[in-house]
């Protein structure tokens, strides 16, 4: 019985060598096969140097468990989601460590319908079997097959189904794939739009997949990773910049001046894009920052619905509400017609179309929203006793709060400002978000007060 520390709350991630290696990948494949008893599973991998070897070890484990394997090659996580629901197979696994350091790799697991396998939905069971390693002998006669396939054309068809290509007017777009898996998909979309006669110019930087990440690990959430995209937008006079993380399940947008747009305001923008096409639809959002999304959705005739943060919660709530779209301020965007999964390609297509339809720049589309509901951005504080600190904050504001909500951590609302404070699931950190109604000095002052209370 070996303890496998690479099994995390939502996925598998570990340092290469002792935490994750080909033997462990083989065990995970066997365990997935024994637990789910799938007939066919799709596999893909990101650009990391170890992804191919880990994927093939995983395939061998699955085949030894009697599972047929379809390998879609180098791909983003969402291409595995797409392959799983499009082919109607029993599951999928993407080998990826997204934006983790160079010496890491990992896996994201789904079952039929691209439903996530995380902590309480099977991941612990797979872990238990992989740790025990007590597998039945391989039955050579019943061993699974292995086949390489390509679904990229069908995937591009699906992506372009979210917009009407005829709505696209002349646009110049900068793409930064960060040498991750997004590059070949961007090339394929460019070729398809060109063939359809769409007047969109693609300017591509760091587009070649390269597992050595010569330009750094792609994680545009970090300000130091945004400079190349910003400069390219300004240099080329582009209408918009789009940057991706390594497995492109998130995309990050920059306006025509190279300004990074916080994910919070993109949620409102995508909600608006969907409500133009689907009046009265329900939109799911997370509790960290809410006022802008609620205002935009309500004004557009939709219904905003708040869900606990995290992909498993958002997807589940979308299913129960039959919501067309769900967005988190962390740049994760979920789509009903994409099997409720998140995609980093659908958002920029919708925003590009919206820019054309509204005849306004991206900066113009979000400027009023940012002024109406200025936000602090997420501030992390490492505390010895997070629960006591949160209780201290609640006691301090208890009398003046107009509303208190515990959907996720502690949210308190006042006449012209609100905050959300939540403990991290994975580390001794509390995460603070503050927003106000059009009053930046108030938002900043309240943020200072909250941080002082937390750190007492």
UniProtKB/Swiss-Prot annotation:
Disulfide bonds: none
Any one GO molecular-function label of the UniProt entry: magnesium ion binding
Residue numbers binding Mg(2+): 98, 245, 247, 249
Keywords associated with the record: Capsule biogenesis/degradation, Isomerase, Lipopolysaccharide biosynthesis, Magnesium, Metal-binding, Phosphoprotein
EC number: 5.4.2.8
Pfam assignment, any one: PGM_PMM_I
Active site per the UniProt annotation: 98 (phosphoserine intermediate)
Cofactor, how bound (note): Binds 1 Mg(2+) ion per subunit.
Catalytic activity of the protein: alpha-D-mannose 1-phosphate = D-mannose 6-phosphate
One GO-annotated biological process of the protein: GDP-mannose biosynthetic process
Gene3D superfamilies (UniProt xref): Alpha-D-Glucose-1,6-Bisphosphate, subunit A, domain 3, Alpha-D-phosphohexomutase, C-terminal domain
Cofactor or coenzyme needed: Mg(2+)
Pathway note: Nucleotide-sugar biosynthesis; GDP-alpha-D-mannose biosynthesis; alpha-D-mannose 1-phosphate from D-fructose 6-phosphate: step 2/2
Chain's role: Involved in the biosynthesis of the capsular polysaccharide colanic acid.
Protein name, UniProt field: Phosphomannomutase
């Amino acid at each position: 019985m070996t303890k496998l520390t690479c099994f995390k709350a939502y996925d598998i991630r570990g340092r290469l060598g002792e935490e994750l290696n080909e033997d462990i990948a083989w065990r995970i494949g066997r365990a997935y096969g024994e637990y789910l008893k799938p007939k066919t599973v799709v596999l893909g991998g990101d650009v990391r140097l170890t992804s191919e070897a880990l994927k093939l070890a995983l395939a061998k484990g699955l085949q030894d468990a009697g599972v047929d394997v379809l390998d879609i090659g180098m791909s983003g996580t969402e291409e595995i989601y797409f392959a799983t629901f499009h082919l109607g197979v029993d599951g999928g696994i993407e080998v990826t460590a997204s934006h983790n350091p160079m010496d890491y790799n990992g896996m994201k697991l789904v079952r039929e319908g691209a439903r996530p396998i995380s902590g309480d939905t099977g991941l612990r069971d797979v872990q238990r079997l992989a740790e025990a390693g007590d597998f039945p002998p391989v039955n050579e006669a019943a061993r699974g097959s292995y086949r390489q396939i390509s679904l990229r054309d069908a995937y591009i068809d699906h992506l372009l189904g979210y917009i009407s290509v005829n709505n696209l007017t002349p646009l110049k777009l900068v793409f930064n794939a960060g040498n991750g898996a997004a590059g070949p998909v961007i090339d394929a979309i460019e070729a398809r739009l060109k063939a359809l006669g769409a007047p969109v110019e693609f300017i591509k930087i760091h587009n070649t997949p390269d597992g050595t990440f010569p330009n750094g690990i792609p994680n545009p959430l970090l300000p130091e990773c945004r400079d190349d995209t910003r400069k390219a937008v300004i240099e080329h006079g582009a209408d918009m910049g789009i940057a991706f993380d390594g497995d492109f399940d998130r995309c990050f947008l920059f306006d025509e001046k190279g300004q990074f747009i916080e994910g919070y305001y993109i949620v409102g923008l995508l909600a608006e894009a969907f409500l133009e096409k689907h009046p009265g639809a329900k939109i799911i959002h997370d509790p960290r920052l809410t006022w802008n999304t609620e205002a935009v959705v309500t004004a557009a005739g939709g219904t905003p619905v708040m869900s606990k943060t995290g992909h498993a919660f958002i997807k589940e709530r979308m299913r129960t509400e039959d919501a067309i779209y769900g967005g988190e301020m962390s740049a994760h965007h979920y789509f009903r017609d994409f099997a409720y999964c998140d995609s980093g390609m659908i958002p920029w297509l919708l925003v590009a179309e919206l820019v054309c339809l509204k005849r306004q720049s991206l900066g113009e589309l979000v400027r009023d929203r940012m002024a109406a509901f200025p936000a602090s951005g997420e501030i992390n504080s490492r505390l010895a006793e997070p629960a006591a600190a949160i209780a201290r904050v609640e006691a301090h504001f208890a009398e003046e709060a107009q509303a208190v909500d515990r959907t996720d951590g502690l949210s308190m609302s006042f006449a012209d400002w609100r905050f959300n404070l939540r403990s991290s699931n994975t580390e001794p950190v509390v995460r603070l978000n503050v927003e106000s109604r059009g009053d930046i000095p108030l938002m900043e002052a309240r943020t200072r007060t909250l941080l002082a209370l937390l750190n007492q």
